[in-house]
């Protein structure tokens, strides 16, 4: 069959031949079952299944006493693919991906903050209650905003994506400001008890900027001197050129006949 490996399909035939040749004492116990239900012989490769994006929403229905849970399915557009990409696994998308992309596009510096990605048991998410943004045992980060926004979309009736984003973002800003105040107060209390701190990040950055500016000034002076030397090589020294221009009119006047 060329590139197809049919060894697994011939397991019943191989077992019978080995028993007849005396390689095995008794036929395997599964020999009758495989004879009745042989392995499937499918040589046609099917295309990968398309994954749909399912959203859970809580909506108020007219005439109903309580909001109803509704599931919205976003149909994925099927595009024509190349023959080499036809059987590749399809991309799996979740609603959190869009929320995460939107948040980090508006807050790119959140990606620069150190993050702890190690979990103690692998099931830490089961202890989190995203009805509030701050969770015990978890540092506040962009993922907290994403999960809080998703909880609002899934549990608050008629909640829109922009409104949930504004609510989660407002809570995030308030907690970030609280962390900054606590950090500043802790530093002031430590200084009051005799602690000394080094230079701040702003002071270090200003010093590096000043050093770079001084190096640039030295480079600019050397470049200016080099440019003047190149100009003097073609035209001559500036003071000599000015003296020659002043002498030429005098020589012209003396050359005129009396």
From Swiss-Prot:
InterPro entries: Ribosomal_mS23_fun. GO terms for molecular function: structural constituent of ribosome. It is found in: Mitochondrion. Belongs to the mitochondrion-specific ribosomal protein mS23 family. Component of the mitochondrial small ribosomal subunit. PANTHER family: 37S RIBOSOMAL PROTEIN S25, MITOCHONDRIAL, SMALL RIBOSOMAL SUBUNIT PROTEIN MS23. This is Small ribosomal subunit protein mS23. The lineage of its organism: Eukaryota, Fungi, Dikarya, Ascomycota, Pezizomycotina.
